[in-house]
Amino acid sequence: MKKIYFPLILVLISFSSFSQGQKRYKNIVFESIDTLMNIPYGQSTNIKNEIEKHSLDVYSPKNDTLKKRPLIVFVHGGGFVNGDKRTGYSRVVSENLSHRGFVVGSINYRLGIAEPKSDVSYFEAMIRAVQDAKAAVRFFRKNAENYGVDTSKIYIAGGSAGAMTALHLAYLDQKEVPAYIDLAKNGSMEGTSGNEGFSSKIHGVVNFWGAMVNFNWLNTGDVPVFNVHGTADKTVPYDSSFAYHNFKYGSQIIFERALSQGIPTGVKLSENLGHTLDNNKPAILSSLQEVGEWLYALVNRTKTTPNITRFEKEIKTHEVEDSKTNYSSNAILFTGSSFIRLWKTIKKDLAPAEIIHHGFGGSNISEMAYYIPRIAFNHSLKAIYMYSGSNDLSVSSQDKSPLQILETYKYVVKLLRSKFPNTPIYYIAISPNERRWAVWDKIQETNELLKNYSSTKPSMYFVETTSALLGGDGKYQPQLHIDDKLHFNEKGYEIWTRIMRKSMAEIK
C-alpha cells in the first residue's frame, strides 16, 4: 500500500450556488470549513517498546449553527507501515465530508509490522490500530461539547489499511479474535491508548478499498456499512480472489454478507480502476457523492439497525401456504412489495397460468434480498416476476440512490441464479403515481439502470409499463389509483394484466 497524494482540486468544488434541493450530509452545503491540527488524543506503546503520543486533526463546518453534529473518525491507509492523517485521500475525504456538514477527526496511530513479517504480525498491527482508533472515539465522547459532536451519531471510516482498521473495530468482537493471536501480548481490542471510562461504540462504517479477515464477523444487528472499491484493485481485493496478508474479503463480499444478515449497507464499485481508484478525480468525487447520500439516510434514521424481520409473519404465512400446495414446475412466481400483495385477483387475471402469489409489505429491495431464498427456493419455477424498489424511492430521508437499488437487485439475482440458473427473471418497472411524483426523475433513472442491466444478462428481462401508465401529458393518471394516491385500483391492475399476459406469452 503506497502513499497517495491528491491535488486539493478534488475538494475545491464550486460553492457559488445551491438549489433548495441540496441537503446537509447528502450534498456539499458549507462553503468553508475550520481545521484544528495535531490535537493530542492518547498514547500507547509501539513495537519499539516506546511510548508514542497520538494526535488527530479536526475538520468542521465553518459558521455552523448546529450544536451537535455527527462525527466521522477517519483512519488513513499505508499498509500499517506508513501514511499520515493529512496527506492524500485522508485530507480529501475529511474536507469533503466536513463541507457536507460532518465533524471529521482524522487520526494518526501506531505504525509498524513486527519481524518476521507474517499474517500474524499484520493482524497484530491491525489490533494496535483498532486500539488507537477506539481511543480516538472515546476522546470525542469525552470532549463532545468542545467539538460540537452528537455522541449518538459517531461513525468510523478509513482507506485501505485504515478501512481494515475501521471494519474490524466495528465487527470483530473480543471473543472472535483468532486463537493464534496472543492477547496477553497485544492487549484487549479496547486497548489502553487513552480516555478510559468512555464508550468506543460507533454507529456505522464507511470502507474505502479495505477488506476483512473473516466476513462471518458481520452478523444481524451489527452497525451499517458502506463500501467503495475499484474492481481492478491488485492490492486489496474488492471480492475474494486473493488476499492482502490474510485480509481476503473485500467490499463486494462485505456488501453481500451485510445484505444476507439484514444489515443496512451499500456499495460503489468503479469498474477497471485499481487501489485508491487510481487517483481518478471523477471516480473519487462520484464515490463521495454516493457516500454522502448513504450517510444522509443513516444520520436521519431513527434506529441504526432497522427491523429486518418486520414482515416475518407474512413470510411464514407464505411458507405455510407453500407446504400445503403442490405447485408444478410450470408455476410462475410473482413477488414484491404491496403492489404485488394487493393484486388480489392476480390468479384469475393471469389464468390459466399457474401463479404463486407472494407479495409482502411495504417491503424494500433490501428486504427482498433478505427473504428471497425463503420466498423462492422451495419451488421449481417456470419464471420469476419481481416488483421491488418502489418503497426505496418514497420521498423519504431513507430513500436509496438508484445505484444502490441496482446493486441490491444484482445480489438478489445472484441468489436466484444459485438455485435457478436458467429460469427467466422479470423485473417490473417501478410505476408512476402522485405520492411519489416528486422523485419521478429518480424512479426513471432506476428503471433505466435496471433495464440496461437486464439487457446484458441471459434470461433476464425488464417489463416496461411506464408508457401505458402515463397520460398524454406525460404525468401519472389519478384514475388508475385508489384513495391513497399510490396503489392501483381495478383499472390500474387491468393495465398490468394486459402487459403481464403479453410478457408471459413469450416465456419459452
Name each model-derived stretch.
Residues 21-67:
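N-terminal cap/lid segment of alpha/beta-hydrolase-fold proteins
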Residues 277-279, 285, 431-508:
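Catalytic His-Asp segment of secreted/periplasmic serine-dependent ester chemistry enzymes
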Residues 248, 255-304, 482-508:
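C-terminal catalytic histidine-bearing segment of alpha/beta-hydrolase fold enzymes
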Residues 122-145, 408:
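Alpha/beta-hydrolase active-site loop
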Residues 86-106:
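Short amphipathic alpha-helix adjacent to the substrate-entry channel of hydrolases
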Residues 67-78:
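Short beta-strand element of the alpha/beta-hydrolase
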Residues 340-354, 368-406, 426, 430-434:
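Oxyanion-hole/transition-state-stabilizing segment in secreted/luminal serine hydrolases
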